[in-house]
């Protein structure tokens, strides 16, 4: 059996088709592919669906700080730092939510205007190659610069901000000259400046200047100093001077000491309206009975004279 040929001994250039010579590297190592490295500011932020979760965390942390007044110092500081981090995270999520909304809203307008600017730019380049007069060349270069800025405007306009259209709608009666001389939006100048500085990507992904309101400002409760009420001292009862009660009965002794008679108080309490009427009626009937006994009235006996 014949031995295998080495790759260096084979006629590789003759066997391989000329159109595929680039794919045959021979002894040289295969060149590594360059990976596209995205800048740090172009990273995708928190998804818009996490806004409610972050708001719930902010509410829980706020209630914990407001209601628990006797928290230790280290726990309180940790919760305050967590609350600040949640608020910053909520602002980023709200900004991403606005960004996605703006992208969806102005996607078709940007696409059509980009296609229109590309077509017009191709026409001007073709005319530039065909023309020979220097004046026309200068004029075409100026128009090409305007269209290049228009094209970059459609591509690198900030995604989080309102997009202002460059071209009028189809129903307008403006001529081509009026369209060229039309006043550009304020962002157009910024795009032209960023083209010179090479910061178009940063302009495209910049955040809006509008401050996003996250939640109501949290007012942390002030610690109230506990004031201990002074304990009242027991009052010393003044001892009444001793009274000589020899030779007095019980009622007299109680009157001398200033003790109220419980029996008299009970009688006074029971003197209601009905009780007083009955008492008056009994007094009248008693007086009549006394008069009957004193007078010469027959009692129905057998020994009357």
Curated annotation (Swiss-Prot):
It is found in: Nucleus, Nucleolus. It comes from the Eukaryota. Residues 270-279 have a biased composition (Polar residues). Residues 49-155 form a coiled coil. Keywords: Coiled coil, Nucleus, rRNA processing. Residues 59-72, 171-209 have a biased composition (Basic and acidic residues). Residues 1-72, 169-305 are annotated as: Disordered. Pfam families: Efg1. One of its GO terms (cellular component) is nucleolus. One of its GO terms (biological process) is maturation of SSU-rRNA from tricistronic rRNA transcript (SSU-rRNA, 5.8S rRNA, LSU-rRNA). The keyword ATP-binding does not apply. Belongs to the EFG1 family. Involved in rRNA processing. This is rRNA-processing protein efg1. It comes from Sclerotinia sclerotiorum (strain ATCC 18683 / 1980 / Ss-1). The lineage of its organism: Eukaryota, Fungi, Dikarya, Ascomycota, Pezizomycotina. The gene is efg1.
